[in-house]
Amino acid sequence: MIHPVRRALAVAASRAPRQFLAAASRTTSVRSVRAAAASGSYYSTTSRRLQDAFPSQLENLASSTLPKVVPQVPQTLTEKIVQRYSVGLAPGKKVKSGDYVTLQPHHCMTHDNSWPVAMKFMSIGASKIHDNRQVVMTLDHDVQNKSEANLKKYRQIEEFANTHGVDFYPAGRGIGHQIMVEEGYAWPGTVTVASDSHSNMYGGVGCLGTPMVRTDAASIWATGKTWWQIPPIAKVTFTGLLPPGVTGKDVIVALCGLFNNDDVLNHAIEFTGAEETMRSIPVDDRLTIANMTTEWGALSGLFPIDAVLASWMRAKATVTAMEHPELGDKAKFTHAKIDALLENPLVADPGATYAKQLYLNLSTLSPFVAGPNSVKIATPLKDLEAQNLKLDKAYLVSCTNSRASDIAAAARVFKDAAADNNGVIPKVAPGVKFYIAAASLLEQKQAEDSGDWQVLLDAGAEPLPSGCGPCIGLGTGLLEPGEIGISASNRNFKGRMGSTDAKAYLASPEVVAASALKGKIAGPGWYQKPEGVEKVIIGEGNGVVEQDKAMSIEDALDKIIAEAESLIANAEAGLTPESTSSSSSSSSSSEEESLTEILPGFPEAISGEIIFCDADNINTDGIYPGKYTYQDNITPAKMAEVCMENYDASFGSIARAGDILVTGFNFGCGSSREQAATAILAKQIPLVVSGSFGNIFSRNSINNALMGVEVPKLVQRLREEFGDKVATRRTGWKLTWDVRRSKVVVEEASGKKWEQKVGELPPNVQEIIARGGLEKWVKSQIEA
């Protein structure tokens, strides 16, 4: 039974005007520590996700696409940070999920792709970087490549950076994402982007990090700005405490594997929990979790600006003051800067609306391993240990898990084993190669000073330069056909770390080290299952009243406020429950009558034979192999030849020019490489149809003039018709995309025809495609 006082509070709050609700939320101070058992959650809804598009005029983006007057509404942490870095907003405008904004990010990082970005920058007619303090360049991906071509590219990048006064970090200094964090570029409460898919990592320090593509980076260099549509926002609440022997890597591997139905695909994630819960997750673990939200399908993974982060920053400020007193207030981390940050830290408003809410009880987690060859397959370590999987290679590398704390965990495995080996550090198992590379030189120095680095060398580990290396399939130590590898990195797609005939697993640093020591996938034995824990407790919102009873008073009030805000918003929009429920039926007829404006010269319809790649989650490595990504002299003919090579080696001989490529769901997930789109164009395939697309791929497609449309019904119908799963199939079906009428017409091999309404391709997107992509569009604007 609900307590009468609580019921009265709920009723009063639900009937109160917005001003009262806001005041009540500000005065609520109860911070209940959630119980170890996971509580339920609920779903609230946001407006329909709009199609990504670059507005016709960057400068007029906000004023041309957003209403001039909007109601004041509670904001999520993501929305608050975006608010600070959006320009050109209407007076009083509060940004919300679904809005298009012009972003002026705090920083923009590029890595080995800096030279291709520079070439785009120069080709559009730009001669000066808009704000050189905004741009950071790092060399980290192909640092083992000593060929003259690669060294020349590296020289060109350094010379370009020096010419424009840009902060530059040479090869061997560290992985770009780690540098952005340790050098303070990824500052809490800011928006910081990079032309790399793992920009999400910055969320570990309360910085909204999200990936951009090369063309976006060139736009930022030239104008200081680019476009972004605020994604749906998911709230992930942690309960319980992270047990000994369980790490941030286990948390994110479990999330990827347990919520593996695209639950957070193309969402911005906000992680939260009771103060005690969040204290159990140190910053290094937060960085790991945020880093791999990319593999979970999200566009960002944001942790709160809290006491844990403040302590981490204070420690860095103290060390800097002691080691470099000459820097004074010019140091990246100072106590004065931290004081200013913490004076009024950004937090989500009570009653902020989330598209989705998920819960995970940390107390019920055990060590997990992802794979083989997929982050969506998460298996408890104890189950894999029982299989005695013989190991060939182990990797303690990448920006995900090769910081000093990770190296210390790996070293501890060998130190513990030395106790049973007369105090001598044992060697890795015969036949196993163990590769190590620190996330940065600073992290390596810290590991060297502690002696942990030397422990791993004594154990027989082979050191590599600080850089991406094996994680992206470059340099020494790649997996050979038939081999099994385990890595502390973030991505184990087939062929990512070497041969497509190898098997790659992902795990925490201590599991990687223990596996190298024992010659099979194994753990160090640090984890002891708590009494009463039988399974991982997770939850999704379903609106069950019994679950609501378990909420804290503050959470309950938040929910009431959210519901009240929804009612108010609908009332202000003139909507009633009856009108919203009938909107779908009434809108269908109006959609039939609406016609999209077609720009002169743009085709009104696109037709072709369907070639079907029957798989979900075809990633960018499958579309365009990583080993070609940084070979900037590859011809279009070669790109066409290797298109889809890692997915299906026979694709090149089956596909024909003019085909329409149809794939499963979440096509183009993975890295931010633009070649995933341009290789398809090189194959002379003008249109990709999918059940759904990865967001970065969608952005790359528009920016590079590749058209795409989502038609889930077509994927389902093809799977019904062709029951036997074939990687690539010529169907004999024909598809016509009627751009003007926003529909597709499908003619099956039997002669049966049917049609389906699809999203509109607005004139501003047509303009980009007609120009040949964003780069040429920006050039046309400069020349105009």
UniProtKB/Swiss-Prot annotation:
InterPro entries: Acnase/IPM_dHydase_lsu_aba_1/3 (IPR015931), Acoase/IPM_deHydtase_lsu_aba (IPR001030), Aconitase/3IPM_dehydase_swvl (IPR015928), Aconitase_4Fe-4S_BS (IPR018136), Aconitase_4Fe-4S_dom (IPR036008), AconitaseA/IPMdHydase_ssu_swvl (IPR000573), Homoaconitase_mito (IPR004418), Homoaconitase_swivel (IPR039386). It is found in: Mitochondrion. This is Homoaconitase, mitochondrial. SUPFAM superfamilies: Aconitase iron-sulfur domain (SSF53732), LeuD/IlvD-like (SSF52016). Its cofactor is [4Fe-4S] cluster. It comes from Neurospora crassa (strain ATCC 24698 / 74-OR23-1A / CBS 708.71 / DSM 1257 / FGSC 987). Catalyzes the reversible hydration of cis-homoaconitate to (2R,3S)-homoisocitrate, a step in the alpha-aminoadipate pathway for lysine biosynthesis. One of its GO terms (biological process) is lysine biosynthetic process via aminoadipic acid. It catalyses: (2R,3S)-homoisocitrate = cis-homoaconitate + H2O. Belongs to the aconitase/IPM isomerase family. Binds 1 [4Fe-4S] cluster per subunit. CDD domains: Homoaconitase_Swivel (cd01674). The gene is lys-4. It is an enzyme of class 4 (lyase). GO terms for molecular function: 4 iron, 4 sulfur cluster binding; homoaconitate hydratase activity; metal ion binding. Residues 1-32 form a transit peptide. Its EC number is 4.2.1.36.
